[in-house]
From Swiss-Prot:
Name by which UniProt lists this protein: Facilitator of iron transport 1
Lineage: Eukaryota, Fungi, Dikarya, Ascomycota, Saccharomycotina
Coiled coil: none
Alphabetized GO MF terms: ATP binding
Segments of this protein annotated with the region 4 X approximate tandem repeats: 20-274
GO biological process annotation, one example: siderophore transport
């Protein structure tokens, strides 16, 4: 209902007579149409609505159409309606002399009221926050479709209405998406509800909700505390709310495993857009130590074929029984048959140092040296076994193994061969580098270097030289072993010192003794 200035003047006269006027008011609020029949005294001033009551006494005492007091009667108006085209001022009535006649709208207990008010151009409707002056004074309506945030905050921007909880309410459905699931909730609130505590506000030119496409949460519901914070995966979401005709946005960062609690009943939607969070699995590089039982057939440069079956256990006290059978053809077209049985009890002690270990991958590289023969002489045969557990890690390790054992050998051979190989090795993360050291024998020294994969098992290393005499029978004896040390710098840039076993000390004396015995035996046979 529009009240003109003339009608207001006549209403004062009617008020003096104690008469009243009955009016039906119709207005639209949030897409809903409200009607109400009001019976009031002609001089009725609607007060008690909080900060918007700027000069109720003025309207009660005077009917000046240019007074801001007339506007007081719409104090319950929510801020969805722009009150006027007036410039922002600091007073309800600057008294500039320039006035504007405007139809303003107010909401009271869920109903919208309209009234025609003539007010000063500098009139400021207080208590409603910042306003953008409108070019027209027609009621600004906000449809429900334009708001995708939670329930309309309030039908009364004042928040101090004397009639809150009067029974007039608005029911709103809130929708939110969380972790690929859609949740809905129905909220019923009083029409005078005021939504506060939303943080920074950014008024925009339109009331349409501003949303971010990447946001998994489309509602204004404030996320609760995560039940699994610190998982390392987070989602940043911009949530939007509409308040008093303005759109406010807020940025929230939450953990990807966030659980939305305290929101009441939830109804997962039938269509669920799955939101998957890809995780990069870091496989474990820790491997169990490898204990290998290997059988290898290897042909040497001197056409030697050997078959070795060995069972070893690294980084522990191990007992190994090795049986080796070899059939050889020498460069002098002589054949030899050697049957060797060695019993070895080996105590391996591995001392490892590493800066940072990320894996434990053990492999055993073993070098076996069998036979130490001299042509036409009875000699000793020794078996040297060096077992080094090789560990692969991100920081190269240096391992040292000192084997100790005794060996007894009986051989018949027409081929003179002196072989001794001791392996000193270390590895990087993918390869092992081994240096085979052979002591000087009869003025000749033999060495060999090789690089191999850390998983390989080397069963036999030997150096051979041709024989120059006929067959001889060898006596069984023991050889004093002297420990020497060989140092080398390998591919990983670290130096390694590995104790070695050299088997030739005292060999000359034994050979001499064997030669004398053989000569006596031969003389006896010839004599017979």
């Amino acid at each position: 209902m529009k009240l003109s200035s003339a009608f207001v003047l006549s209403a004062i006269t009617v008020a003096a007579l104690g008469e009243s006027i009955t009016t039906t008011i119709t207005a639209t609020k949030n897409g809903h149409v409200y009607t109400k029949t009001v019976t009031q005294d002609a001089t009725f001033v609607w007060a008690g609505e909080g900060a918007a009551v700027t000069s109720a006494v003025t309207e009660a005492s005077t009917v000046a159409a240019t007074s801001a007091a007339a506007e007081t009667s719409v104090a319950a108006e929510t801020s969805i309606v722009e009150p006027s085209t007036s410039a922002q001022g600091t007073s309800a009535d600057e008294g500039s002399g320039s006035s504007i006649t405007t139809t303003i709208t107010a909401t009271k207990n869920g109903h919208v009221y309209t009234k025609t008010v003539t007010q000063d151009a500098t009139f400021v409707w207080t208590g409603e926050g910042e306003r953008a002056p409108a070019s027209t004074v027609a009621t600004v309506e906000t449809s429900v479709a334009a708001e995708t945030s939670v329930a309309e905050p309030s039908t009364s921007a004042q928040g101090t209405s004397a009639d809150e909880g009067s029974g007039s309410s608005i029911t709103t459905t809130i929708t939110a998406t969380k972790n690929g699931h859609v949740y809905t909730k129905t909220v019923t609130q009083d029409a005078t509800f005021v939504w506060t505590g939303e943080g920074e506000r950014a008024p925009v030119s339109t009331v349409a909700t501003v949303e971010t496409a990447a946001s998994p949460v489309t509602s204004v519901a404030e996320p609760s505390a995560s039940t699994d914070e610190g998982s390392g995966s987070s989602i940043t979401t911009t949530i939007t709310a509409t308040k008093n005709g303005h759109v406010y946005t807020k940025t929230v960062t939450q953990d990807a495993t966030f659980v939305w609690t305290g929101e009441g009943e939830r109804a997962p939607a039938s269509t669920v857009a799955t939101s998957s969070i890809s995780a990069i699995e870091i496989p474990s590089t820790t491997e169990a130590s490898i204990v290998e039982a290997s059988s290898a057939v290897e042909t040497s440069s001197a056409a030697e074929t050997s078959s070795a079956v060995e069972t070893s256990s690294a980084v522990e006290t191990s007992s190994a029984v090795e049986t080796s059978s070899a059939a050889e053809t020498s460069s002098a077209a002589e054949t030899s048959s050697a049957v060797e049985t060695s019993s070895a009890v080996e105590i391996s002690s591995a001392v490892e140092t590493s800066a940072v270990e990320t894996s434990s991958s053990s492999s055993t590289i073993e070098t076996t040296s069998v036979k130490s023969l001299s042509p036409t002489q009875t000699s000793l045969s020794s078996s040297v076994q060096a077992s080094s557990p090789i560990e692969t890690s991100s920081a190269a390790k240096t391992s040292s193994v000192v084997p100790t054992f005794s060996s007894t050998t009986t051989e018949n051979s027409s081929n003179s061969k002196s072989t001794s190989a001791v392996v000193a090795s270390t590895t990087t993360s993918s390869e092992s580098s081994a240096t085979i050291v052979t002591p000087t024998r009869i003025g000749q020294a033999y060495t060999e270097s090789s690089s191999r994969d850390a998983q390989s098992v080397r069963t036999h290393e030997s150096n051979n030289w041709s024989s120059s005499s006929s067959a001889s029978t060898k006596m069984v004896s023991s050889i004093t072993r002297v420990q020497t040390t060989t140092a080398g710098i390998f591919t990983n840039g670290k130096s390694s010192t590995t104790p070695q076993i050299v088997n030739y000390t005292g060999a000359a004396d034994s050979i001499a003794a064997g030669t004398g015995l053989m000569g006596a035996a031969l003389a006896a046979v010839i004599f017979l």
